[in-house]
């Protein structure tokens, strides 16, 4: 509630996880999805959304708005799980409140589970990032909704493998049962570290200020060199292009001793964008 304007969450609504990568990879399987299931993923996305669906043998459909699903798949019942990500990896795009509400309405209509990956939500540079659990988005009804959060980004705790899932109490209870019998419990020391980090807002502001400074420097340098920055309203990345194939841009940066990620790692097919991280030390 303090950070995200989400009310009505109790311990029954929260599930600690061993880092959100593990969660993303195994959630479709833990929800009981199979070859008869359909998973919606963003068109430009973290690859593990697709990997998780593949592990469950589920069908994968890429879409960024419910309107894109009017014809395929059947909008009235064949969708089982929807992933959204705002601010997004790799593009840094921040979804509007109206977009999020559209996904909630679609979820209510289809009976799907909607999971919002909000791991970069503490780092928004333009506009505002909303949680899917915000009353303004879901009307106070968390049924069918889950929000994923990670301490790797907000608290620089990647090595701890610490995150949590929050939302629908029934889904959380079912996942808790499956996960504890699978040995996927967060250790007591890591749990204590999570509590300490989540109780402290000061270090998050320090992190955000550091990334904001780096972002300003990197944006200016890229734009001066002729690059265009697409989206990038949030997250820890700049989604940059100079209008050539992304692999040529990767090579161009490599000759300068700079490592960037090719856009075709995140999209099906070709891409002209590269992901430029803001996480290298000053």
Predicted regions located by residue number:
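Conserved core of the PLP fold type I
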Residues: 1-105, 122-123, 127-140, 146
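Hydrophobic residues in well-ordered beta-strands that form the structural core
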Residues: 41, 62, 116, 186, ...
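Helix C-cap/helix->beta junction micro-motif
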Residues: 56, 109-110, 225, 256
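Conserved core segment of the aminotransferase class I/II
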Residues: 136-212
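Conserved PLP-binding active-site segment of the aspartate aminotransferase-like
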Residues: 167, 237-244, 256-282
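Conserved glycine-rich beta-strand-loop-beta hairpin in the small C-terminal domain of fold type I
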Residues: 191, 195, 211-219, 228-241, ...
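Short, conserved charged micro-motifs
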Residues: 245-252
């Amino acid at each position: 509630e303090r950070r995200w304007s989400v009310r009505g969450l109790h311990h029954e609504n929260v599930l600690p996880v061993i880092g959100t990568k593990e969660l993303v990879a195994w959630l479709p399987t833990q929800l009981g999805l199979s070859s008869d299931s359909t998973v919606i993923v963003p068109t430009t996305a973290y690859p593990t959304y697709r990997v998780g669906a593949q592990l469950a043998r589920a069908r994968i459909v890429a879409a960024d708005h419910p309107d894109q699903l009017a014809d395929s798949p059947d909008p009235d019942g064949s969708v089982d799980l929807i992933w959204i990500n705002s601010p997004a990896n790799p593009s840094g795009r921040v979804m509007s409140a109206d977009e999020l509400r559209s996904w909630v309405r679609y979820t209510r209509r289809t009976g799907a589970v909607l999971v919002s990956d909000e791991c970069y939500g503490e780092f928004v540079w333009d506009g505002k990032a909303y949680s899917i659990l915000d009353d303004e988005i879901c009307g106070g009804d968390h049924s069918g909704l889950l929000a994923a959060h990670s301490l790797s980004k907000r608290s620089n705790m990647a090595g701890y493998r610490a995150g949590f899932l929050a939302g629908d109490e029934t889904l959380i209870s079912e996942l808790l049962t499956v996960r504890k019998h699978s040995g996927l419990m967060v250790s007591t020391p890591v749990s204590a570290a999570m509590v300490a980090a989540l109780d402290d807002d000061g270090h998050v502001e320090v992190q955000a200020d550091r990334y904001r400074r780096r972002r300003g420097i990197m944006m200016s340098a890229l734009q001066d060199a002729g690059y265009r920055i697409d989206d990038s309203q949030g997250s820890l990345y700049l989604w940059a292009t100079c209008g050539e194939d992304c692999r040529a841009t990767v090579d161009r940066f490599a000759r300068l001793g700079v490592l960037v990620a090719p856009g075709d790692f995140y999209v099906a097919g070709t891409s002209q964008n590269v992901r430029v991280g803001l996480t290298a030390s000053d």
